[in-house]
């Protein structure tokens, strides 16, 4: 550690034990070095991944979670070339920037994806966050740890944006919204004349709907048990919104809605029976995208013969196969054109309501909570 570090004072929501509440505490954050940037957070989305890590997915404790931040650059390290103080940015996932996948424009498949985003990646030159007692707190969750008034990210995962949209609402573009829209556009390649069946009408599923409609998909069917979310899906452009519990034969209903079967389908639940329905409703030659987090021992709900005979591809998807530096500006352009109203998914919370926002996410009471500072 560099003993001559300068620090700023901030507030951050710290998780100290598995399953525990997040406590807003005073912290000190060392100034950025190298390719790092210090961000004053304007808003940060709450994602199911935050819940998963709170509840036991292995991350180093104590930790500051949060990985859908947006804000203003306050300081930069000496190696930063594309950002300066005053720039408005959306923060996304971390990547190494130099492996083959990163070099080829696929940072979501970075060979260091797990350690850089979940594994306690270290800051440059021993930089750190200290709690009120002077003890270190892990602070590079998804390269940002943005559940706080300030965060340190890297130049590679800070995307500069314009000043024409509410900065505090843009953070979810860096993960949840990017995951859904990118799954439809980048991974499945949805376009005019094609159809898509989306299983789950949460933030990721409805973002996939927005992405599919933005690029001209013909029919988009959302399968969701919550009546309010089905209604919202129809308002956002779904051709059909089906209640899986009310359909006697769900696969038949999807095939009827799509004129014989969906070109592609997308599962956001991670549940094997649901993925089985996605496979069954997809036309031969189509792709079943999978973004939902399954249980560790969840089986694939199809035999190899099923997949071979139907010629359906199972496609696991991380972060919408997106390069955030390119895809976040594309989503914003869709929004400016009136084709991507992602703000319809957002519910605002104050930062001191963080545990309420986490609860609302867990119970499905809010589609995309955003903590506003």
Curated annotation (Swiss-Prot):
Highest rank taxon of the organism: Bacteria
Binding residue positions for Zn(2+) 2: 96, 99, 102, 110
The EC number(s) this enzyme carries: 1.1.1.347, 1.1.1.144
Pathway(s) this gene product operates in, as recorded in its UniProt entry: Terpene metabolism; monoterpene degradation
Coiled coil: none
A Pfam family the protein falls into: ADH_N
UniProtKB keywords: Metal-binding, NAD, Oxidoreductase, Zinc
Residues bound to Zn(2+) 1: 47, 67, 175
Purpose of the protein: Involved in the degradation of the monoterpenes beta-myrcene and limonene. During anaerobic degradation of beta-myrcene, catalyzes the NAD(+)-dependent oxidation of geraniol to geranial. Can also catalyze the oxidation of (S)-perillyl alcohol to perillyl aldehyde, and to a lesser extent, the oxidation of nerol, citronellol, cumic alcohol, and benzyl alcohol. Cannot use NADP(+) instead of NAD(+) as cosubstrate.
Protein name: Geraniol dehydrogenase
């Amino acid at each position: 550690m560099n003993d001559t570090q300068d620090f700023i004072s901030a507030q951050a929501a710290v998780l100290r034990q598995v399953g525990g509440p997040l406590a807003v505490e005073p912290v000190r954050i060392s100034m950025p070095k190298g390719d790092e940037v210090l961000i004053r957070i304007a808003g940060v989305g709450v994602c199911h991944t935050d819940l998963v890590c709170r509840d036991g997915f292995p991350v180093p404790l104590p930790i500051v979670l949060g990985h859908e931040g947006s804000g203003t650059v306050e300081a930069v390290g000496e190696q930063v070339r594309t950002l300066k103080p005053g720039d408005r940015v959306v923060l996304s996932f971390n990547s190494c920037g130099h492996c083959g996948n990163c070099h080829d424009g696929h940072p979501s498949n970075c060979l260091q994806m797990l350690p850089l985003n979940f594994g306690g990646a270290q800051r440059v030159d021993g930089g750190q966050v200290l709690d009120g007692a002077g003890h270190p707190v892990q602070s590079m969750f998804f390269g940002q740890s943005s559940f706080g008034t300030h965060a340190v990210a890297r130049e590679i995962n800070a995307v500069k944006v314009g000043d024409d949209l509410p900065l505090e609402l843009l953070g979810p573009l860096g993960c949840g919204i990017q995951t859904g829209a990118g799954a439809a556009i980048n991974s499945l390649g949805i376009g005019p004349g094609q159809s898509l069946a989306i299983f789950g009408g949460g933030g990721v599923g409805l973002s996939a709907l927005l992405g599919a409609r933005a690029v001209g998909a013909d029919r988009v069917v959302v399968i969701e048990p919550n009546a309010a979310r089905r209604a919202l899906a129809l308002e956002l452009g779904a051709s059909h919104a089906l209640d899986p519990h009310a359909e006697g034969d769900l696969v038949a209903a999807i095939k009827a809605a799509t004129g014989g079967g969906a070109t592609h389908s997308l599962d956001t639940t991670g549940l094997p029976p649901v993925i089985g329905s996605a496979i069954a409703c997809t036309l031969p030659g189509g792709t079943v995208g999978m973004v939902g987090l399954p249980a560790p021992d969840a089986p694939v709900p199809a035999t190899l013969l099923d997949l071979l005979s139907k010629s359906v591809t199972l496609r696991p998807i991380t972060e919408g196969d997106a390069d955030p530096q390119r895809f976040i500006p594309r989503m914003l352009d869709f929004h400016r054109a009136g084709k991507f109203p992602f703000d319809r998914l957002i519910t605002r919370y104050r930062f001191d309501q963080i545990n309420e926002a986490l609860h609302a996410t867990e119970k499905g009471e809010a589609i995309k909570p955003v903590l506003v500072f």
